Regions:
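Bacterial lipoprotein signal-peptidase II cleavage site
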Residues: 16-30, 34-36
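Short amphipathic alpha-helical "recognition" segments used for binding
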Residues: 6-7, 39, 47-48
């Protein structure tokens, strides 16, 4: 019996030694590699300076429709702000811009006063003859001067091919005869469509309610005008299938 017990003890010790000898040492186990391969030379870089060069008016005018454009210009007037967008009439010393639904916070909209200089980046578009900047963002040009354009008298250009060269500028007309006044939807509160005559030509102008709403003097003035009245007008030389000035002032012709 004693020999059997001694034999069993010896066998147990031998098995324990074998188990210890085959245990893996964690300190010597190689860790998996986490190194990221370096990019090859044909991979395209990301990021970078995306600031576009500011165009002159001549460069903007020459740009193709749908081209990306960046301009610096001065606010002359705005339409009503709505849902983080605002439409801007702008100008510089060389030309004018209609910036349609510019992306803008309500706080910044309040700062877009006449004369304020802004840098605008968007795309050049065209709709029914009106050339505009669309899908645009902007920033204020800090420390810039201010500029408010004087209306350019384009009376003598009515009916000529030269009139469109001044598209979107602040303009004036002298001694126009009222031919018809029509309220959109048939009653005051919306746009006013005004047909005027000069010489043998007739032209369609508009009191745009989002620019000059029903509480403004120019809007109210049309309640007292009638066919045959002779007036002077100021406005922005908008285009819609021909001249369609957005009227900002009207007074009796002297």
């Amino acid at each position: 019996m004693k020999k059997l017990i001694a034999l069993l003890l010896a066998l147990t010790m031998a098995l324990a030694l074998v188990a210890c000898g085959t245990t893996n040492d964690p300190a010597t186990t190689p860790a998996p590699t986490t190194e990221t391969p370096a990019p090859t030379s044909n991979e395209e870089p990301t990021g970078g300076d995306e600031t576009a060069a500011v165009m002159t008016y001549a460069e903007y005018e020459a740009a193709a429709i749908d081209a990306a454009v960046t301009v610096e210009c001065y606010v002359q007037a705005t339409q009503s702000w709505w849902e983080d967008k605002i439409t801007v009439y702008a100008q510089d010393a060389d030309g004018a811009y209609f910036i349609y639904e510019l992306k803008c916070s309500e706080e910044d909209a309040a700062k877009l006063t006449a004369g304020t200089k802004i840098r605008v980046s968007g795309f050049k578009g065209e709709w029914s003859g009106e050339v505009e900047i669309m899908d645009a963002t902007f920033e204020f040009v800090e420390g810039a001067d201010t500029f408010v354009a004087e209306p350019l008298d384009v009376t003598d250009l009515l009916g000529t091919e030269d009139l469109i060269k001044h598209q979107n500028k602040k303009v004036s007309f002298k001694e126009l005869t009222i031919k018809k006044i029509e309220y959109k939807n048939g009653e005051p509160g919306d746009d006013i469509y005004v047909t005027v005559a000069k010489g043998e030509g007739e032209y369609s102008f508009c009191v745009e309610r989002y620019l000059t709403d029903p509480v403004t003097d120019v809007y109210k003035a049309f309640a007292d005008l009638k066919e045959g009245d002779v007036v002077n007008m100021e406005g922005f030389l908008y285009w819609y299938e021909g001249v369609n000035t957005h009227i900002t002032a009207v007074t009796p012709a002297a």
